[in-house]
């Protein structure tokens, strides 16, 4: 207490209150992490029967943000097929297929694999499949390439009919998922702590939305990461909370773990500046962050796409909003209802572990292919 006696009454009171606040924050965070770790330890890992298949997997060749998806799919395939070979779009895919004679050539994303190459691979007798992981944003391109594959898997529910109209007969909805080697509950330093966190690029739809909530967010401990946020009209209000940079998946997970609330706001499928979707295919399905936020054990507040109830229970495993006003209202509510917030986050984590890993998705893909052989 010697230090406290040297302070004036106001300083002493501030120091005591600060210590209490820090203790409360640390205790609260530790309790949440402990409960999350119990959920993870009690989860029964998904195990799928290995398929008697030889597979040649062609990565996206796109770098971030697609390379982590490549890695997660490959790791899941390693557990579930008899033989796996991996190549990039820069490799001679026709030559490799001729040499290896895989039963399946699985192309991820496929922007750098020409239709001529796909046709040549098919002529060699291998079954071809593509998993489009960023539909409907590249529909102007994918509508021309999909017909050349034997099987088409898409992350976007609305694209099933879209590809069928292009002449594809075997089209399946296959959502993305979480890589549990990256996104999971973990202890992080206090520098990662926040009341509210948002990670994502400043597409114009997001810019307009954040302009409306910026005055409110400026009063909170907020962290925002991503490209182009200087476009905000309200940038001056939030500049000290914004880092205009792309975060690695590992860093993203740390900020999710340190946040009380993580906002998810989907990009618009109609943004002509960035999209190649001139036919204006709707976006009904949830983005990868939906799974990653829940997989981190964080509390998610998301705008609700039509397919969300098929993946998570709104109000049970995460929370939703439909306007800027409702988002502010729910941020306030859940910041002041910690137990309810943490309960939803835990249930979201449980659901993710049970249903939404890349092991689950690859098992579905392989089951479709084996059943139709």
Describe each region flagged by the PLM:
Residues 49-61, 68-88, 253, 257-373:
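Catalytic binding pocket for nucleotide-activated donors in carbohydrate/polymer assembly enzymes
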Residues 1-49:
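Membrane-proximal basic amphipathic "stem/tether" segments
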Residues 93, 117, 142, 249-252, ...:
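Acidic, amphipathic alpha-helical patches
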Residues 36-169, 180-184:
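Extended catalytic core of nucleotide-activated donor transferases of GT-like folds
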Residues 188-261, 267, 271-274:
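Conserved catalytic-core segment of nucleotide-activated headgroup transferases in glycan assembly
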Residues 83, 149-150, 168-172, 234-247, ...:
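Active-site regions of enzymes building and remodeling cell-envelope glycoconjugates
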Residues 177:
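Carbohydrate-associated surface elements
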């Amino acid at each position: 207490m010697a230090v406290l006696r040297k302070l004036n009454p106001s300083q002493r009171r501030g120091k005591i209150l600060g210590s209490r606040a820090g203790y409360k924050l640390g205790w609260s965070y530790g309790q949440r992490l402990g409960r999350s770790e119990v959920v993870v330890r009690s989860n029964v890992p998904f195990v799928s029967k290995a398929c008697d298949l030889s597979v040649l997997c062609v990565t996206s060749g796109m770098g971030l943000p697609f390379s982590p998806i490549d890695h997660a799919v490959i790791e899941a395939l390693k557990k579930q097929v008899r033989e796996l070979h991996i190549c990039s779009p820069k490799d001679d895919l026709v030559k490799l297929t001729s040499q290896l004679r895989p039963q399946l050539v699985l192309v991820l994303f496929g922007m750098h694999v020409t239709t001529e190459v796909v046709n040549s691979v098919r002529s060699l007798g291998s079954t071809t499949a593509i998993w489009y992981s960023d539909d409907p944003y590249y529909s102007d391109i994918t509508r021309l390439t999909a017909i050349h594959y034997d099987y088409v898997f898409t992350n976007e529910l609305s694209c099933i009919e879209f590809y069928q109209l292009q002449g594809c007969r075997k089209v399946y909805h296959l959502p993305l998922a979480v890589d549990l080697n990256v996104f999971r509950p973990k202890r992080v330093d206090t520098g990662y702590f926040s009341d509210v966190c948002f990670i994502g690029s400043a597409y114009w739809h997001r810019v307009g939305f954040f302009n409306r909530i910026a005055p409110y967010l400026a009063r909170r401990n907020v962290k925002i990461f991503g490209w182009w946020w200087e476009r905000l009209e309200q940038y001056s209000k939030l500049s000290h909370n914004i880092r205009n940079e792309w975060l690695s998946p590992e860093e993203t997970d740390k900020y999710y773990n340190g946040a009380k609330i993580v906002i998810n706001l989907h990009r618009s499928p109609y943004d002509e500046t960035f999209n190649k979707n001139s036919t204006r295919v709707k976006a009904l399905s949830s983005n990868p962050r939906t799974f990653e936020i829940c997989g981190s054990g964080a509390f998610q507040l998301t705008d609700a796409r039509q397919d969300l109830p098929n993946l998570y229970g709104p109000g049970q495993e995460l929370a939703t909003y439909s306007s800027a006003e409702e988002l502010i209202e729910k941020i306030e509510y859940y910041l002041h209802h910690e137990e309810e917030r943490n309960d939803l986050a835990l249930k979201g984590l449980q659901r993710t572990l049970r249903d939404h890993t890349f092991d689950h998705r690859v098992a579905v893909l392989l089951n479709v292919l084996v059943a139709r052989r």
